[in-house]
Amino acid sequence: MNNARTNAKRRRLSSKQGGLSISEGKESNIPSVVEESKDNLEQASADDRLNFGDRILVKAPGYPWWPALLLRRKETKDSLNTNSSFNVLYKVLFFPDFNFAWVKRNSVKPLLDSEIAKFLGSSKRKSKELIEAYEASKTPPDLKEESSTDEEMDSLSAAEEKPNFLQKRKYHWETSLDESDAESISSGSLMSITSISEMYGPTVASTSRSSTQLSDQRYPLSSNFDHRGEAKGKGKQPLKNPQERGRISPSSPLNDQTKALMQRLLFFRHKLQKAFLSPDHLIVEEDFYNASKYLNAISDIPFLNYELITSTKLAKVLKRIAFLEHLENDELYDIRQKCKNLLYSWAMFLPNEPSIKGM
């Protein structure tokens, strides 16, 4: 009796739905869901199949999909957000001039020979630079694979990275902050920021200025920034004219005061890193005393912005110190808590998004 009533209800409900039963309706939606999941898995698998030296297309902000070569893959965390998950980044070389940059995983896809031929054979209007890039991608150069250090895997570079060499192409050398004989390096393109030494020449580590001199000096605000430390001008400006942009980039000129401020932050970062993160250094009380002075000086610097603390890697060093499991004799100076306080204040009051993407 109960079965008959149940079957009757099912027939009535089926007739209201145009002859489609509930079970049939659910099954009919399954193929689309399966196809969507399959597409997502195929995209993830394609990303995982990318290897060193593969030709790829990269989507950088303000540019079309651009041919490039894959150099390296690594995982990193946001310097300011202590709760963020790991992000997958790729180091790539852009055709035809081989400027390099770090880009996010969702900005990369494989480049096939058929796609190169299709683009070059298309009658659509395209820029001369993009055509040259696709032409150069047909015969990519031989590469020597780069090696990753333990510090990079920990999302902290103890020294500036040394990029690899391309055959028949000259690369810019990058120098370590730990070396005293730093060399002046010519700047790269807007998307090639990986090293302060490449951007601004000799670091403060190679100068003879003392920490007291650096701490006592005040640097007036750069003409490129307003009273809040933000770039002047409203609206998004085109990447084609980096010289006109009110922000720090390798392509925009820096006045002496801004360079001095960058060197000052690099000096503090170098001293803090050497005192607390160097595996061969024995921490003494003088390190705590000096670190306290450095942190106080950093907190007193006006007009800091996201680019200053991330391009100098100061935020990474402070974060690493702040989360040291054990720091003997830190009760008196409370260095770890001071680092956390600085990171918290930056996360609250500085712009959340970097103005240079992919970094």
UniProtKB/Swiss-Prot annotation:
UniProt record, GO biological process: chromatin remodeling; DNA damage response; regulation of transcription by RNA polymerase II
Consequence the record notes for mutating W66A: Reduces the association of set9 with nucleosome and the H4K20me3 levels
Gene3D superfamilies linked to this entry: 2.30.30.140
Molecular function terms from GO: double-stranded DNA binding; histone binding; histone H4K20me3 reader activity; methylated histone binding
One Pfam family linked to the record: PWWP
Alphabetic keyword roster: Chromatin regulator, DNA damage, Nucleus, Phosphoprotein
Residues annotated as domain PWWP: 52-114
Described purpose of this protein according to its UniProt entry: Necessary for DNA damage checkpoint activation. Required for the association of set9 with chromatin and subsequent methylation of H4K20. Associates with H4K20me1 to increase the concentration of set9 on chromatin to perform H4K20me3. H4K20me3 is mainly enriched at heterochromatin and is required for proper heterochromatin assembly.
Comment block on domains: The C-terminal region mediates association with set9, whereas the N-terminal PWWP domain recognizes H4K20me1.
Annotated protein name in UniProt: PWWP domain-containing protein 1
Gene name linked to the record: pdp1
